[in-house]
Amino acid sequence: MMEKTFIMVKPDGVQRQLIGDILSRFERKGLQLAGAKLMRVTEQMAEKHYAEHQGKPFFGELVEFITSGPVFAMVWEGENVIEVTRQLIGKTNPKEALPGTIRGDYGMFVGKNIIHGSDSLESAEREINIFFKNEELVSYQQLMAGWIY
């Protein structure tokens, strides 16, 4: 079954010019890009995005960081795309992330860990709706799919 997930290169990843490398990793894995945009996250969007952390001591820092500069927001499609992208991304704390993962290769500190990826189908749907309008997403038949799955 084709799933969708939300992936965001955070301000530190954008500033460090990692967008192209990150895109390439997902494309080389065989995932299909359905939408992408460079944007600024508003405070309201950040609060919705991090709603589950509201009331926690680090909530303010999360909102401040994600609104501190441009992000690169993306929607990817593929079979088991959430599981696959989370493996490519690596553990939340870059010190625990394996080499070869995005966070393992580029992350230094848990507060600036380069990238966000949805952790469930429910989260993906909620996050996609925060950052994208339906008409900004394009689903199409990937001609390589037969060679991947």
UniProtKB/Swiss-Prot annotation:
Its cofactor is Mg(2+). GO terms for biological process: CTP biosynthetic process; GTP biosynthetic process; UTP biosynthetic process. The modification Phosphothreonine is found at residue 92. It holds the Pfam family NDK. The modification Phosphoserine is found at residue 123. InterPro entries: NDK-like_dom, NDK-like_dom_sf, Nucleoside_diP_kinase, Nucleoside_diP_kinase_AS. One of its GO terms (molecular function) is nucleoside diphosphate kinase activity. Its EC number is 2.7.4.6. HAMAP family: NDP_kinase (MF_00451). Homotetramer. Belongs to the NDK family. This is Nucleoside diphosphate kinase. It comes from Bacillus subtilis (strain 168). The lineage of its organism: Bacteria, Bacillati, Bacillota, Bacilli, Bacillales.
